[in-house]
Each structure stands twice: as C-alpha cells, then as structure tokens.
C-alpha cells in the first residue's frame, strides 16, 4: 500500500469525496484502523484525557506526543499521521520549530496547532522549514480556561472572525484545517471558502472530512459524552465492524446527522 499524502485529501476535496479520520494513540489500534482502511490518523493531545486521565489537555507534553507518535507510526506505517503540538509548545515560531522537529522525527507527517491569525508567522516559519501544518479553529481545547469550558464557538459576529482566521492560516501555508464545535452554517462557509481540506468534529456533515476521538467512536468515553459523538460499536458489534461503519457513514454523509450538529 502506498503512503497516504496530503495530495490525496486535496483530491478528495476537489472530487467532493468525504473522508474519515480518527485519533490513535498506540500500535494496536493504529494497526486496526489501518487494516480497515482509515488512512489519516491524529495523535491528539486528547490523550491527556483519554489515556492519562486528566480533566483537560493542558498537562500533555511534547515528549508524550512523541512517544505515542512513534507507537502509532509503527502500527500504521503508510498512514498520513498528524500530531498535535501541545499547550505552550508553540508560543513563539522558534519554539514551534524546535518542538515540531521532535514530533516529525518521531514519525509525524504534519503538526496540528490551535489558534487563529496570531499563528500566521508560526505557520509561515514551519512551512518554510518543510513542516506541514494543520490548523485548528472553533473550540480549541487548549483554550478551555479562556472559553470558560467546552462550548460551541463561532456564533454571531464571531463567525466572521473565525472565517477570517481560516483564510489567514491558509494564506500562511496551512494545508489542512480542523473545525471543532461550530454551527453547520459556518462550517459550510469555511469549507467552501478554503481551497485546503477541512476536517470537522462537531461541525456537521458539510466539511470535507470528519474526525472522532476513538474512545467516542467506541462508546468508551468516561464522563460527559459530546453531542457530536456516536457509539458505532453499539450497532456494529465488534471494533473492526464499527470502524467500517464509521467510515461508510462519513463517506455517505449519514454521519454526522442533525442530532450531532449545532446551529
């Protein structure tokens, strides 16, 4: 199997073919996802909550991300692998470059960073130094203390600000964008305005791709279950079938449905 590249996702956007992505944190699940056909995975700082048991993503370190990136890469050698730069790992462009080098050497193909136009110089510096960048707008979990909790973003006038941020990130060189917990109407505007692929989570079925935290997809999340989550394991019966069902529902536009979306 050939390695999956950003060019393939760009082609999916052009041909209006939805694609499914998922978080992965270890060898075994990465291999399972790859075996069933998921070719894009994220080593997310969500591991702080799902793996380490913290109440936010803030305690996650670059070393944590690198450790899990190495494990996932061994399980899915041909996937397009995104890795988060965690909280305060990219406060300056220079710091971002140093930490991106660590996770890229661990096996990442691209780094994901949270934030808007203030990251333009960082995105430029990374891309000029051959580090592909995925932006992340909307509900950015590293900003939970600013937001006052995990709340939908981009309603009202904030929607135009988010769209402007998305365009600024693309112009700076970002090659992917994750949109989290925003109204469907805004997600549609952003997806149509950008030439780069947009991956949604809690953004309706109007984005080019979808991502879910694997624990949400399997119904094993402790505590609060996000509105946009769906337990595919409950219907499918086993993990492999659940992965296939998730992919099929994303590709057909069945998931996420209205019950998983915000307005």
From Swiss-Prot:
Pathway this chain belongs to: Cofactor biosynthesis; (R)-pantothenate biosynthesis; (R)-pantoate from 3-methyl-2-oxobutanoate: step 1/2
Q: Mind listing the UniProt keywords for this protein, alphabetically? A: Cytoplasm, Magnesium, Metal-binding, Pantothenate biosynthesis, Transferase
What EC number(s) is this enzyme filed under?
2.1.2.11
Main location class: cytoplasm
Q: Which GO terms describe its biological process?
A: pantothenate biosynthetic process
Superkingdom, natural source: Bacteria
Claim: DNA-binding is one of the keywords in the record? no
Instruction: Write down the HAMAP family for this protein, in alphabetical order.
Output: PanB
Subunit annotation: Homodecamer; pentamer of dimers.
Q: What is this protein called?
A: 3-methyl-2-oxobutanoate hydroxymethyltransferase
Q: Which organism is it from?
A: Salmonella paratyphi C (strain RKS4594)
């Amino acid at each position: 199997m050939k390695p999956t590249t950003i060019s393939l996702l760009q082609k999916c956007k052009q041909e209006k073919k939805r694609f499914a992505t998922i978080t992965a944190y270890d060898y075994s699940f990465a291999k399972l996802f790859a075996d069933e056909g998921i070719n894009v995975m994220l080593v997310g700082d969500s591991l702080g909550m799902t793996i380490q048991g913290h109440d936010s993503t803030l305690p996650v370190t670059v070393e944590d991300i690198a450790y899990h990136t190495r494990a996932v890469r061994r399980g899915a050698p041909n996937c397009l692998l995104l890795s988060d730069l965690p909280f305060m790992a990219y406060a300056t462009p220079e710091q971002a470059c140093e930490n991106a080098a660590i996770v890229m050497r661990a096996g990442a193909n691209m780094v994901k960073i949270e934030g808007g136009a203030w990251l333009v110089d960082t995105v430029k510096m990374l891309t000029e130094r051959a580090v592909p960048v995925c932006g992340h707008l909307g509900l950015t979990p590293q900003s939970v203390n600013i937001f006052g909790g995990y709340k939908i973003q981009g309603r009202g006038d904030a929607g135009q600000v988010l769209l402007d941020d998305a365009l600024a990130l693309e112009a700076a060189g970002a090659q992917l964008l994750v949109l989290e917990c925003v109204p469907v109407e805004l997600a549609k505007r952003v997806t149509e305005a950008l030439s780069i692929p947009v991956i949604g989570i809690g953004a309706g079925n109007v984005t080019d791709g979808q991502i879910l935290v694997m624990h949400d997809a399997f119904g094993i999340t402790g505590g609060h279950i996000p509105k946009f989550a769906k337990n595919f394991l409950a219907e499918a019966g086993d993990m492999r079938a659940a992965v296939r069902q998730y992919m099929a529902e994303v590709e057909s536009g069945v998931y996420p449905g209205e019950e998983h979306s915000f307005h």
